[in-house]
């Protein structure tokens, strides 16, 4: 009797130990590259079977059949250490095929399922997909979660239309979340739709993160060659906590319908992982998967001669349509042939013309926010994101406009700085050339600097002017010294400075900009820019440099302080005027009188001194933008301005006449027109080299 009691006690201890081990098993991992030889690990019911080459076939094309297949062991998905009902993180990936058929539209679809039991013998076919039936659909006692891959639309409405969508279902086959079958392209984040019933392998990644209750689902054809970065569905699913019980079975269910709405459903490979904060299902090696099934239709009882006649007629008609299509495409290509340039390949962020057309309401006049020498700027609204953009439409048949178009893409397209306008992309449609920028709401600096009080209610404040000046200096420093190449802007002026909603300046319009490798010399031979902002050495050699940008900044700085344009009349030049006031001890007379006493005298004197220093007639005596910014930030003292800063009236007149003569000469005009005869053939090499 005592020995029997000991045996009972020992068995009880062993049972409790085993139960404890079972409750502490919290991770499950498996991977199947095909299912041949794994029959014992897959619990199958209904029409499901494993084919001779290792495919898991859930259903064939027979009408009104159901097939289910679950992993043979339950998976622990509730966190037993938590006081709350917390679903553990899990991850799964599988590759499936639904062969297409010439005699059927397919149906009804299949699901990936979490179920408290692998036995779904009471489930119905058609829209219930072998998971539920008409009596229990929607019951909270089901404790079923499913991702449905539906090829027939019209659940419970009796229409049974052709469908192609993915849904998230909780205790019901009526989806809480539903999306058309698609993936997001990694190149341009565009959504690309595709068909489930295609006969090609399709891969699914399903990841659930327990702490955040977030579910991500990605689906794409394996021919894509990569997993898209953006999931098709990314949602919080708090409902899952009410669905999942301690142990769940994971697997698949599928069903077909009547009246030709039937498909075969195959799973080629499957991996799963649960437990831990970020479990990750093992990657499936496509090379190890069994071959896909043949894409053939189920035989029907049609007369062979009738079928042969239909096939023959269809073939003839198809050939004629293909030939007609090829002829039309050839004719259209001959009319609108477009050859991709190097710069188009290197800078692929291309907008679709129809999107820009919609964004600007057909480029209406009431959308115009500005005009330039070579184009018109429109305000646009991207409907998909509610973002505002600025669209610059280059004047058609303008060769210099085409030069600016390509130059902006090759320079501004790669520059990123808080004080530069951000170029989002470009568009080339027939003879239309368009550049797309961030929309800057406050317009250009000149419109604020010279605005009438009735427009803005007040003149531009001194604090705003000084901060704008420092912001422009910061942007030029980035161009000259901080980017990978040296960028010479060549057209620094108020109309090319845009002011954002926080009154920060953004230097833009890089149509005349040139890029150089560090250590190389500028080799431009054409005088470009705006009268009043061009450095005097341009009249001698036409050679732009960072020093000529510094000169233009100096003029702009004096203009910001004085509120006066650099060349109000034929003999007036702002730097000469400020220098004369400096020499006579009346430098404060240069400050914009509209400011009254609302300015900082120390900052004003500093800005005027830096402006004069930048306007030195000798380029080698002008400071680098690094020093300009240090002066404005008062990190360095500004050198004293000497009497020999300027040049005599005779030398100034001589240089001015040379500059005007140079701009109007044959040399300048011929250099401007040195382009290809085609508007779409502009060499990027010549632009980068500075010609």
Curated annotation (Swiss-Prot):
UniProt keyword terms in alphabetical order: ATP-binding, Cell membrane, Kinase, Lectin, Membrane, Nucleotide-binding, Receptor, Serine/threonine-protein kinase, Signal, Transferase, Transmembrane, Transmembrane helix
Question: GO cellular-component terms in the record?
Answer: plasma membrane
- In Gene Ontology terms, what is a biological process of this protein? abscisic acid-activated signaling pathway
- What EC number(s) does its UniProt record assign? 2.7.11.1
Q: What protein family does this chain belong to?
A: In the C-terminal section; belongs to the protein kinase superfamily. Ser/Thr protein kinase family.
Instruction: Give the residues annotated as active site.
Output: 491 (proton acceptor)
**Disulfide bond annotation, renumbered to this chain:** none
List the ranges whose topology is Extracellular: 20-306
Map out region (Legume-lectin like) in residue numbers.
Answer: 26-273
Specify the Protein kinase domain's residue ranges: 363-641
Q: Which SMART domains match?
A: S_TKc (SM00220)
Chain ranges on the Cytoplasmic side, renumbered to this chain: 328-691
**Which of this chain's residues are annotated to bind ATP?**
369-377, 392
Task: Using the record for this protein, list the coiled-coil segments as residue ranges, or answer none.
Answer: none
The residues that cross the membrane are 307-327
Signal peptide (from-to):
1-19
Q: This chain belongs to which protein, by name?
A: Lectin-domain containing receptor kinase VI.4
Q: How does it sit in the membrane?
A: Single-pass type I membrane protein
Q: Where is this chain's protein located in or outside the cell?
A: Cell membrane
Q: Name one Pfam family in it.
A: Pkinase
Q: Report the domain of life of the source organism.
A: Eukaryota
Q: What happens when the gene is disrupted?
A: Slight enhancement in abscisic acid-inhibited germination. Redundant with LECRKA4.1 and LECRKA4.2.
Which catalytic reaction applies to this protein? L-seryl-[protein] + ATP = O-phospho-L-seryl-[protein] + ADP + H(+); L-threonyl-[protein] + ATP = O-phospho-L-threonyl-[protein] + ADP + H(+)
Tell me, what does this protein do in biology? Involved in negative regulation of abscisic acid response in seed germination.
SUPFAM superfamilies from the xrefs?
Concanavalin A-like lectins/glucanases, Protein kinase-like (PK-like)
Primary enzyme class? transferase
């Amino acid at each position: 009797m005592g020995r029997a009691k000991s045996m009972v006690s020992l068995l009880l201890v062993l049972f409790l130990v085993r139960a404890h081990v079972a409750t502490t098993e919290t991770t499950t991992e498996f991977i199947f590259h095909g299912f041949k030889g794994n029959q014992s690990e897959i619990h199958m019911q209904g029409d499901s079977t494993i084919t001779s080459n290792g495919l898991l076939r859930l259903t064939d094309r027979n009408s009104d059949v159901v097939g289910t297949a679950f992993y043979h062991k339950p998976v622990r998905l509730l966190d037993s250490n938590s006081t709350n009902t917390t679903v553990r993180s899990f991850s799964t990936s599988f590759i499936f095929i639904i062969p297409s058929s010439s005699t059927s539209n397919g149906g009804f679809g299949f699901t990936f399922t979490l179920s408290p039991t692998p036995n779904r013998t009471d489930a119905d076919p058609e829209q219930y997909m072998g998971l539920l039936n008409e009596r229990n659909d929607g019951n909270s006692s089901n404790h079923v979660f499913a991702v449905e891959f539906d090829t027939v639309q019209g659940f419970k409405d009796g229409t049974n239309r052709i469908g192609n969508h993915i849904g998230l279902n909780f205790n019901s086959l009526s989806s809480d979340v539903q999306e058309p079958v698609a993936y997001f392209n990694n190149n341009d984040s565009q959504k690309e739709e595709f068909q489930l019933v295609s006969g090609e392998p399709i891969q699914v990644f399903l990841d659930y993160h327990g702490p955040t209750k977030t579910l991500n689902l990605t689906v794409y054809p394996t021919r894509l060659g990569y997993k898209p970065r953006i999931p098709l569905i990314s949602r919080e699913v708090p409902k899952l906590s009410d669905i999942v019980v301690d142990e769940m079975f994971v697997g698949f269910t599928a069903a077909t319908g009547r009246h030709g709405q039937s498909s075969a459903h195959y799973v080629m490979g499957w991996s799963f992982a649960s437990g831990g904060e970020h479990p990750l299902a093992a990657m499936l090696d496509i090379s190890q998967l069994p071959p896909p099934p043949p894409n053939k239709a189920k035989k029907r009882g049609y007369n062979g001669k009738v079928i042969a006649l239909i096939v023959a007629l269809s073939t003839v008609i198809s050939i004629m349509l293909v030939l007609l299509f090829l002829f039309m495409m050839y004719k259209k290509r001959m009319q609108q042939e477009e050859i991709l340039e190097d710069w188009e390949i290197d800078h692929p962020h291309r907008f679709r013309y129809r999107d820009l057309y919609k964004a600007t309401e057909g480029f209406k006049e009431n959308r115009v926010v500005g005009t330039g020498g070579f184009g018109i700027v429109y305000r646009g609204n991207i409907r998909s994101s509610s973002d505002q953009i600025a669209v610059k439409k280059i004047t058609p048949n303008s060769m210099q406009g085409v030069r600016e178009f390509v130059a902006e893409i090759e320079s501004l397209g790669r520059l990123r700085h808080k004080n530069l306008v951000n170029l989002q992309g470009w568009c080339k449609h027939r003879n239309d050339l368009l550049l797309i920028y961030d929309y800057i709401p406050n317009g250009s600096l000149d419109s604020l600097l010279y605005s009438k009080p009735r427009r803005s209610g007040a003149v531009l404040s001194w604090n705003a002017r000084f901060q704008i000046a420092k912001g422009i200096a910061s942007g030029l420093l980035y161009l000259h010294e901080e980017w990978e190449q040296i960028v010479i802007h060549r057209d620094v002026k108020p109309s090319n400075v845009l002011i954002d909603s926080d009154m920060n300046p953004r230097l833009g319009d890089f149509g005349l900009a040139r890029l150089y490798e560090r250590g190389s010399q500028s080799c431009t031979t054409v005088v470009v820019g705006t009268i009043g902002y061009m450095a005097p050495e341009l009249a001698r050699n036409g050679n732009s440099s960072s020093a000529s940008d510094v000169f233009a900044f100096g003029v702009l700085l004096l203009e910001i302080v004085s509120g006066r344009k650099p060349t109000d009349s034929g003999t007036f030049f702002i730097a000469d005027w400020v220098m004369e006031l400096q020499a006579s001890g009346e430098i404060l007379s240069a400050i914009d009188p509209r400011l009254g006493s609302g300015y900082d005298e120390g900052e004003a004197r500093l800005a005027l001194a830096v402006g004069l220093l930048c306007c030195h007639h000798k380029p080698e005596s002008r400071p680098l933008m690094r020093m300009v910014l240090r002066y404005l930030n008062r990190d360095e003292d500004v050198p004293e301005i000497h009497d020999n800063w300027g040049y005599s009236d005779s030398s100034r007149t001589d240089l001015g006449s040379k500059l005007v003569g140079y701009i109007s000469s044959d040399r300048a005009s011929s250099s401007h027109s040195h382009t290809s005869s085609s508007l779409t053939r502009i060499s990027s090499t010549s632009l980068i080299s500075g010609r």
